[in-house]
Amino acid sequence: MRLSGRGLRCVRGGREVFDGLDFEAAGGEALALIGRNGAGKTSLLRLIAGLLMPAAGSIDFDGSEPDTPVAEQAHYLGHRDALKPSLSVVENLAFWRDFLGGEPTDLMAGITAVGLSHAAELPAAYLSAGQRRRLSIARLLVVRRPIWLLDEPTSALDVRGQAMFARLMSDHLASGGLIVAATHSPLGITTREMRIGAAA
């Protein structure tokens, strides 16, 4: 299983973010994107996720479902938590499972894995920033996708939350999944670094 990009060019708002960018990540590997703010780390994640279209180049995934678009085999966890404040923890997770086309699953297993079982019926509006982040992470668990695209994934997580997420990432990699992450903080797992843009 291998995810790759060749000759990628990204233009946003009339400004060229990067050009001629190549990358590659294999199953079981975590690729950490590093670079100054504005270098294009988030833009690359959004290109892979299908949220932006490249001005040039291509992205390919040699996985178990070659006819399925890359975007449909990837989870994108942005730096903002996409939650409905009026819905409970379990209702938010059910929404994302259904939205992403997942099979009926035990939502409580995902909720327990991120340490929110005590708050399962609590509206998201009442969650702390760290709890909201944990709930967002639970989305990765209820629908199985081999590619995790993570943008500052440990933001708002305390030390225990970071350790919890490191375990989940390790489990994902051990099962053959791959991770591409943009982060300024250590992820707590072994990564291969890729610099985007000129050194600061």
Swiss-Prot record:
It comes from Rhodopseudomonas palustris (strain HaA2). PROSITE patterns: ABC_TRANSPORTER_1 (PS00211), ABC_TRANSPORTER_2 (PS50893), CCMA (PS51243). This is Cytochrome c biogenesis ATP-binding export protein CcmA. Residues 1-200 form the ABC transporter domain. GO terms for molecular function: ABC-type heme transporter activity; ATP binding; ATP hydrolysis activity. The keyword Manganese does not apply. Its main location: membrane. Keywords: ATP-binding, Cell inner membrane, Cell membrane, Cytochrome c-type biogenesis, Membrane, Nucleotide-binding, Translocase, Transport. Part of the ABC transporter complex CcmAB involved in the biogenesis of c-type cytochromes; once thought to export heme, this seems not to be the case, but its exact role is uncertain. Responsible for energy coupling to the transport system. NCBIfam families: ccmA. Its EC number is 7.6.2.5. It comes from the Bacteria. It is found in: Cell inner membrane. One of its GO terms (biological process) is cytochrome complex assembly. GO terms for cellular component: plasma membrane. ATP binds at G35, R36, N37, G38, A39, G40, K41, T42. It is a peripheral membrane protein. It catalyses: heme b(in) + ATP + H2O = heme b(out) + ADP + phosphate + H(+).
